[in-house]
Curated annotation (Swiss-Prot):
Keyword Kinase attached: yes
InterPro entries, per database record: Kinase-like_dom_sf (IPR011009), MAP_kinase (IPR050117), MAP_kinase_CS (IPR003527), Prot_kinase_dom (IPR000719), Protein_kinase_ATP_BS (IPR017441), Ser/Thr_kinase_AS (IPR008271)
Function comment: Mitogen-activated protein kinase; part of the MST11-MST7-PMK1 MAP kinase (MAPK) cascade that is essential for appressorium formation, penetration and invasive growth. Central regulator of appressorium development that acts downstream of the cAMP signal. The MST11-MST7-PMK1 MAP kinase cascade transduces signals from the cell surface sensors MDB2 and SHO1 that recognize various surface signals such as surface hydrophobicity, cutin monomers, and rice leaf waxes.
PTM comment text: Phosphorylated by MST7.
Organism: Pyricularia oryzae (strain 70-15 / ATCC MYA-4617 / FGSC 8958)
Keywords recorded for this protein, A-Z: ATP-binding, Kinase, Magnesium, Nucleotide-binding, Serine/threonine-protein kinase, Transferase, Virulence
Deletion consequences: Impairs the formation of appressoria and the ability to infect rice plants, even when inoculated onto wounded leaves. Leads to decreased transcription of the cell surface sensors MSB2 and SHO1. Blocks the transcription of both virulence genes GAS1 and GAS2 during appressorium formation.
Encoding gene (name): PMK1
Protein's name in the database: Mitogen-activated protein kinase PMK11
Required cofactor(s): Mg(2+)
Family: Belongs to the protein kinase superfamily. CMGC Ser/Thr protein kinase family. MAP kinase subfamily.
Length: 356
């Protein structure tokens, strides 16, 4: 292992050290997050361009949990529309193990950057949503909820290939354990959160990811977020401003009495037709959007149904939309016991996962 030539970040104000194998020639910083930095690199033996994600998770249990989920799930899925881990840098020893290096496919940009800088054609919207749903079909068939789908987690390259990334908040859909700990860790961007996440704390289904896809489609169609809430209350207000006050059936579908009382305290709102909000959009796109953004998760379209929707007909191929086997029950064992695990125990889990 070598201390590879450290890249400067864009401001050039500080150096970032990358302790990776000499097989990699580190190039540029391409992204930074709360507990990590991503650099582009060239794998010298093959000439392949890669992304190396350096993570320093060991200061916080939450970062350790996210890193563990990310490593385990990205290794589990082998799918064209889910970012893959090509390699993980093995540490010299447990004692000197302070950083995690994930070597991944290099993608050129992400949906957030693309939406900010250009208008997308209807054809682009179709192809991008199709690929997102194709990835989601694999996740949901494996009983995995992504829980943090948003434009910046959809990576893109010049041929318009799309890959979903960041599985740090993912969890098992099969798990029936109480979700009360879910919100404490749920720092996901509020704008793409399904209304049921804010209205009850008990059960989350695959429908939460479908809602996020609806928000992403709306943003691709208009160039701006559909529900850019400033806080919890504002978020719900924006959703109801568009969808209108829930019907009695949907109202009684809300499990939490407090949430029902809160909705009842709000002024009555009429539904705004999507045609008014998206005047230039095709009828088929709006029809799919309506179905993705159904207020009631029980009535929301499933991923399989969405893939069959006429809007995606140019791309839909039932023989080329693979599923993944359901994750084994013990896969998320560390999550079930997360409140009792020390940072040192989590570090051991991460080390074992890298060395396996």
């Amino acid at each position: 292992m070598s201390r590879a030539n450290p890249p400067s970040n864009s401001s050039g104000s500080r150096k970032i050290s990358f302790n990776v194998s000499e097989q990699y020639d580190i190039q540029d910083v391409v992204g930074e997050g709360a507990y990590g930095v991503v650099c582009s690199a060239i794998h010298k033996p093959s000439g392949q361009k890669v992304a190396i994600k350096k993570i320093t998770p060991f200061d916080h249990s939450m970062f350790c949990l996210r890193t563990l989920r990310e490593m385990k799930l990205l290794r589990y899925f082998n799918h064209e529309n889910i970012i893959s881990i090509l390699d993980i840098q093995k540490p010299r020893s447990y004692e000197t193990f302070n950083e995690v290096y994930l070597i991944q496919e290099l993608m050129e940009t992400d949906m957030h950057r693309v939406i900010r800088t250009q208008d997308l054609s209807d054809d682009h919207c179709q192809y991008f949503i199709y690929q997102t749903l194709r990835a989601l079909k694999a996740m949901h068939s494996a009983n995995v909820l992504h829980r943090d789908l948003k434009p910046s987690n959809l990576l893109l390259n010049a041929n318009c290939d799309l890959k979903v990334c960041d599985f740090g908040l993912a969890r098992s859909a099969a798990s029936q354990e109480d979700n009360s700990g879910f919100m404490t860790e749920y720092v996901a961007t509020r704008w793409y959160r399904a209304p049921e996440i804010m209205l009850t704390f008990k059960e989350y289904t695959k429908a939460i990811d479908v809602w996020s896809v609806g928000c992403i489609l709306a943003e691709m169609l208009s160039g701006k977020p559909l529900f850019p809430g400033k806080d919890y209350h504002h978020q719900l207000t924006l959703i109801l401003d568009v969808l209108g006050t829930p019907t009695m059936e949907d109202y009684y579908g809300i499990k939490s009495r407090r949430a029902r009382e809160y909705i009842r305290s709000l002024p009555f709102k009429k539904k705004v037709p999507f045609r008014t909000l998206f005047p230039k959009t095709s009828d088929l796109a709006l029809d799919l959007l309506e179905k993705l953004l159904a207020f009631n998760p029980v009535k929301r379209i499933t991923v399989e149904e969405a893939l069959k929707h006429p809007y995606l007909e140019p791309y839909h191929d039932p023989d080329d939309e693979p599923t993944a086997p359901p994750i084994p029950e013990e896969f998320f064992d560390f999550d079930k016991h997360k409140d009792n695990l020390s940072k040192e125990q989590l570090k051991q889990f991460i080390y074992q996962e890298i060395m396996r």
